[in-house]
A protein has these predicted regions:
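A short linear-motif detector with a strong N-terminal bias
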Residues: 13-15, 74-76, 105-110
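Residues in well-ordered beta-strands of folded domains
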Residues: 36, 97, 130
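Short HxH-centered metal-ligating active-site micro-motif
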Residues: 59-102
Length: 149
């Protein structure tokens, strides 16, 4: 399915995908990255990858606490922030709908959220990310937590 910008998303990303900015395209002047978050089916609101907000700080702290040193580099990313919201809110499942795909999920990408999320999310909890990839195709992936805390 496509939103008003013509960006394609998985069907379960709607109606939120209709309200996202145009998809982020690497190497170009871009629209801002934005994500809508749900925890256990309850809408939480939208977040951006701002570096200085409280969720980025908490994600950096969690990376440190879990000794995921490389994950600190992406602590401002919306997926990492959503994972912190999930953990601190004692939820079991987060859904993130964003106008991109997680870093690290595309062929030839360096390590990123796609690699770190399973070790960042606690055992028994999960996150589904719905977005649109670099080629404009729908993206859907569920990350099952492996962290012991």
């Amino acid at each position: 399915m496509a939103n008003p910008h013509g960006d394609r998303y998985p069907p379960e990303a709607f109606p939120d995908a209709d309200d996202l900015p145009p998809r982020v395209r690497r190497g170009r002047g871009n629209a801002r990255l934005e994500a809508f978050i749900q925890i256990d089916g309850k809408p939480i609101g939208s977040i951006t990858p701002a570096r200085g907000d409280v969720w980025a700080q908490r994600a950096a702290r969690r990376s440190f606490d879990l000794e995921l040193w490389q994950a600190d580099d992406v602590s401002n990313h919306v997926e990492m922030k959503a994972a912190v919201i999930l953990v601190e809110g004692r939820g079991t499942h987060a859904q993130v709908i964003l106008n991109h795909a997680p870093c690290g999920s595309e062929k030839y990408d360096p390590a990123g959220c796609d690699d770190y999320l399973p070790d960042f999310i606690p055992i028994g909890r999960s996150m589904t990310v719905l977005g649109t990839d670099a080629r404009g195709n729908p993206f859907r992936r569920t990350y099952e937590g492996k962290a012991v805390r």
